[in-house]
Swiss-Prot record:
Disordered: annotated segments: 40-82
One BP annotation, GO: regulation of lateral root development
Modified residues (Hydroxyproline): 67, 70, 74
Subunit details: Interacts with the CEP receptor CEPR1.
Molecular function per GO: hormone activity
Protein name: Precursor of CEP3
Record note on disruption phenotype: Larger root systems when grown under nitrogen-limiting, acidic, osmotic stress (e.g. mannitol) and high salt conditions, as well as in the presence of sucrose and under decreased or increased light irradiance. Reduced the lateral root density at low temperature (16 degrees Celsius). Increased root and shoot growth when grown hydroponically.
Modified how: The mature small signaling peptide is generated by proteolytic processing of the longer precursor.
Family that this chain belongs to: Belongs to the C-terminally encoded plant signaling peptide (CEP) family.
Length: 82
């Protein structure tokens, strides 16, 4: 009798989960404003001035990055002091 109750409970539980995912959420309608509607409400701003190119970061030396033995990695944020 107890095993039947467990199966009934599991069936009802799975049924309620599936019903919740089937219903989902309601989507609301929204209107898309067109460029004509935006221009009618105010003036159009000019585009922003071009930006200056960024400098490339400095290059690193050969000794900056080196391989470590497996199991002996210092980890992120820790330097190796020999």
């Amino acid at each position: 009798m107890a095993t039947i109750n467990v199966y009934v409970f599991a069936f009802i539980f799975l049924l309620t989960i599936s019903v919740g995912s089937i219903e989902g959420r309601k989507l609301t309608k929204f209107t898309v404003t067109t460029s004509e509607e935006i221009r009618a409400g105010g003036s159009v701003l000019s585009s922003s001035p071009p930006t200056e190119p960024l400098e490339s970061p400095p290059s690193h030396g050969v000794d900056t990055f080196r391989p470590t033995e497996p199991g002996h990695s210092p980890g992120i944020g820790h330097s190796v002091h020999n």
